[in-house]
């Protein structure tokens, strides 16, 4: 089981008299995720234990992507440079169509298309904003896209039942 969310830094101020609100969208946005693995035998669990302990809490990073977020046969190459914090890129003239809700990778980070993009040199709108500047000609990766992650806390643990089956649940945040 995988629970994913996009966390945003948004400030909200509400009047105690009129309940009118004002919002301010700060730059912060990151993916967060909790993963629960199916029950594993001792032999299967050993490598998971070693991996989690080897991360040394929040100090280590790793790549991870949702195994169901795979879109084969889609190709989008950037037609121009894209600055950090951008939320759209212009595809090259041979770029494929992309449906809203499609995940992709640029550099070390995961993004989701927020609107349909038609084939050709059109804008691909996405969230969260770019984490790094991207050069023209860079290709978006739609095949098992991943992001760079770290554990969300320094505690590691797992459970074992009477049948010697191991259970793992761990939380992670995008490593920015």
Whereabouts are the PLM-identified features?
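Autoprocessing Asn-cyclization modules and mimics
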Residues: 46, 54-106, 115-120
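Small/polar beta-strand repeat architecture
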Residues: 1-6, 66, 73-74, 95, ...
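N-terminal targeting peptides, primarily Sec-dependent signal peptides
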Residues: 1-13, 33
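Short, solvent-exposed beta-alpha or beta-beta edge segments that form flexible loop/patches at the rim
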Residues: 12-20
């Amino acid at each position: 089981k995988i629970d994913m969310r996009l966390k945003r830094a948004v400030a909200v101020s509400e009047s105690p008299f009129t309940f009118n609100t004002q919002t301010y969208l700060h730059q912060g946005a990151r993916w967060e995720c909790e993963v629960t693995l199916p029950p594993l035998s001792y032999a299967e669990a050993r490598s998971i234990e070693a991996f989690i302990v080897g991360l040394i809490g929040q100090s280590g990073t790793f790549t991870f992507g949702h195994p169901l977020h795979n879109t084969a046969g889609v190709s989008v190459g950037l037609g121009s440079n894209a600055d950090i914090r951008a939320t759209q890129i212009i595809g090259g003239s041979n770029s494929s169509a992309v449906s809203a809700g499609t995940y992709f990778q640029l550099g070390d980070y995961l993004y989701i298309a927020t609107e349909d993009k038609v084939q050709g040199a059109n804008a691909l709108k996405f969230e969260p904003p770019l984490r790094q500047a991207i050069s023209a000609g860079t290709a978006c990766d739609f095949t098992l896209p991943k992001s760079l992650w770290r554990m969300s806390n320094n505690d590691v643990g797992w459970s074992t039942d009477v049948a010697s089956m191991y259970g793992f649940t761990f939380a992670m945040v995008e490593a920015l």
